[in-house]
Each structure stands twice: as C-alpha cells, then as structure tokens.
C-alpha cells in the first residue's frame, strides 16, 4: 500500500538551524528566546500535544531534523493510513488573499476519528438504552 500525504518539507537553512538544537521533548523557546518560535521536538514516550490547524509548523520529528508530514500528523490524530487528504499541502493564497484549506489544515481542524467514534458510541448507548434497563 502506498502511503499518501507523506512528503517532507524542504526546510531553509535558518529553520534547520533552529530545529537541530531542540532535544527530544524540548521546545526551542526553552533554549533561546531570540528565535521567537514554539518549535517542539516530540517525545516518542509521551502523548503528543494537540494538533491544530496552525500549529503543525511547531512539531519536530523525534529523531529527524524536520517537521512532521501531513501523514504523520494524521496518524497522531488516528486517521487510517488509507485516508487521503486533498488540496494543497501548505498555505497558498488566491489573488483575493483568500486562504485555501490545506492538507495540514484538514488534519488540524479534524476531530480525531477514534475520539469521534467513542463519543458517537456513548451517545448511541445512552440514546438507545431502554428505560426498563435502568430500573
């Protein structure tokens, strides 16, 4: 199976300089305030911080000096590997300065599928529970 949405970003030398100094589980802001960034390297032994629409730029791969791909963020959000995100990968603007919904945005704005399933099942259980079962 081909894994979709797993293209790495080509980082500028200045971005790589920032990424390289962040230890596992650490944040760039803990090292130097001069960068003015919230880059954080994920700790593979801890839960991920919340994935958001705009925060995708902040997640550094635990072992590689790069940001996470759309697919890696989607895995954190519990999307199945066969799920494909469409549209542009990164922010792009139309001539009217309207931001299009990016693949990163789709992942960050989504309710994690396993969470949605758990909530739906809880509602279903409550909704279809027979009143006589409660007595």
Question: What name fits each language-model region?
Answer:
Residues 1-135:
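C-terminal target-recognition/interaction regions appended to catalytic cores
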């Amino acid at each position: 199976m081909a894994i979709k949405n797993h293209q790495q970003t080509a980082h500028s030398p200045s971005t790589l300089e920032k990424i390289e100094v962040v230890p596992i589980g650490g944040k760039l802001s803990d090292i130097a305030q001069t960068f003015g960034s919230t880059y954080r390297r994920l700790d593979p032994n801890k839960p991920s911080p919340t994935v958001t629409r705009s925060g995708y730029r902040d997640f550094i791969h635990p072992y590689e000096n790069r940001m996470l791909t759309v697919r890696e963020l989607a895995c954190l959000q519990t999307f199945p590997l066969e799920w494909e995100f469409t549209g542009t990968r990164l922010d792009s603007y139309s001539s009217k300065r309207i931001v299009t919904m990016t693949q990163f945005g789709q992942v960050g704005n989504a309710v994690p599928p396993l969470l949605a399933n758990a909530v739906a099942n809880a509602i279903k259980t409550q909704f279809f529970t027979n009143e006589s079962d409660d007595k």
